[in-house]
Amino acid sequence: MDKLEEIMASKRKSLEHVIRPIKARELETLARSKSPSIPFIEALSSPDQLSVIAEIKRKSPSAGDIAKGMNAVEQARVYNNSEADALSILTDTDYFGGSLNDLWDVVDFLHQHERITPCLRKDFMVHPIQVLEAAEAG
């Protein structure tokens, strides 16, 4: 088994307790009700300007620890103050040291400070329930 197969098997196993049938209508309804303040594509499409997606990542399978113990909200604050156009938040725990709570916390921070930086959940997406989780986080 190669590394990607190992990661995907681990991800499926970790989701066993939350998996339930998801209807397309449920995803569509959530998508309509959770539109971001500024669309992701719009945030990255300023003409004549380099767009930056800043990543919140503690470790990776290939590099090991990158920023062990990093506070996701503090890192988001640094990136936001540096005018990142969007944030990518790793939510995989086992291989990247993140969590879905990191996404919730960063989105809450941005809303509390009236910032409109779009956030992307970066994970191994193997089931539609993960899309719902990301949308619920904002």
Which stretches of residues belong to each language-model region?
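Alpha/beta enzyme core
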Residues: 66-90, 109-114, 128-138
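An N-cap/entry alpha-helix motif that binds or orients negatively charged groups
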Residues: 2-67
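Glycine-rich beta-to-alpha transition loops that act as phosphate-gripper elements at the mouths
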Residues: 55-59, 68-70, 96-97, 118-131
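Short, conserved beta-strand segments within well-ordered enzyme catalytic domains
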Residues: 51-55, 86-88, 118
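Arg/Lys-rich RNA-binding interfaces used to dock onto structured RNA substrates
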Residues: 57-61, 70-71, 88-94, 98-106
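Alpha-helix-loop-beta-strand connector modules within alpha/beta enzyme cores
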Residues: 35-42, 47-48, 97-120
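Residues forming well-ordered secondary-structure scaffolds
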Residues: 98-101, 105, 126-129, 137
